[in-house]
UniProtKB/Swiss-Prot annotation:
It comes from the Bacteria. HAMAP family: Ribosomal_uL6_B (MF_01365_B). This protein binds to the 23S rRNA, and is important in its secondary structure. It is located near the subunit interface in the base of the L7/L12 stalk, and near the tRNA binding site of the peptidyltransferase center. One of its GO terms (cellular component) is cytosolic large ribosomal subunit. Gene3D superfamilies: Ribosomal protein L6, alpha-beta domain. This is Large ribosomal subunit protein uL6. Part of the 50S ribosomal subunit. Signal peptide: none annotated. Keywords: Ribonucleoprotein, Ribosomal protein, RNA-binding, rRNA-binding.
Length: 182
């Protein structure tokens, strides 16, 4: 049995959870999230707690058991507090500018790259080198941050590019000069 899946989820005050079979809707101060869960798990409300239980004991059911509990917990945290991911731009002349709800990246290409956020995601720029992706759906926030990072991944020789805040980029040594045959 999954140790994560066995833990009950506390529903905080101000959060409304509607369970209709395997369809769950969570409403909170930040918004509303809905998700359909796999038939391998059942979701029940017991007082102030949500309990996820597996239907069988096969390998696939055990895998979806812990996953379903974590997805449900992320829905509750998202509508209560929201999620955000911070990105940093490293490199001379590389910058990001806000243009309405879009962000324009100038990261060393001959052209600038404009990124428009999908519904439910907000992009903000702090200074010219810090970008914050925020929203209530953890999957969407992470996906948007990954797409922005993929515009110009950090270079392993100089470290230039777009990286997650706090991400360590291992710098490779350059070519050794003066070695070999003369």
């Amino acid at each position: 049995m999954s140790r994560i899946g066995k833990m009950p989820i506390k529903v905080p005050l101000g959060i409304k959870v509607d369970i209709n079979g395997n369809d769950v809707t969570v409403k909170g101060p930040k918004g509303t999230l809905s998700r359909s869960f796999r038939p391998e798990v059942t979701i029940n409300r017991e007082g102030d707690y949500l309990v996820v239980a597996p239907v069988g004991t096969d390998k696939a059911t055990r895998a979806f058991f812990g996953l379903s509990r974590t997805l449900l917990d992320n829905m509750i945290v998202g509508v209560k507090d929201g999620f955000d991911k911070n990105l940093e731009i490293v490199g001379v002349g590389m910058r990001a500018d806000k243009d309405g709800d879009k962000v324009v990246f100038k990261v060393g290409f001959s052209h600038s790259v404009t990124v428009a956020p999908p519904a439910g995601i907000t992009l903000s720029v702090d200074g010219t080198t810090k970008v914050k992706v925020s929203g209530i759906n953890k999957e969407d926030v992470g996906q948007m941050a990954a797409e922005i990072r993929s515009i110009r991944k950090p270079d392993h020789y100089m470290g230039k590019g777009i990286r997650y805040a706090g991400e360590y980029v291992r710098i490779k040594p350059g070519k050794a000069i003066g070695k070999g045959a003369k």
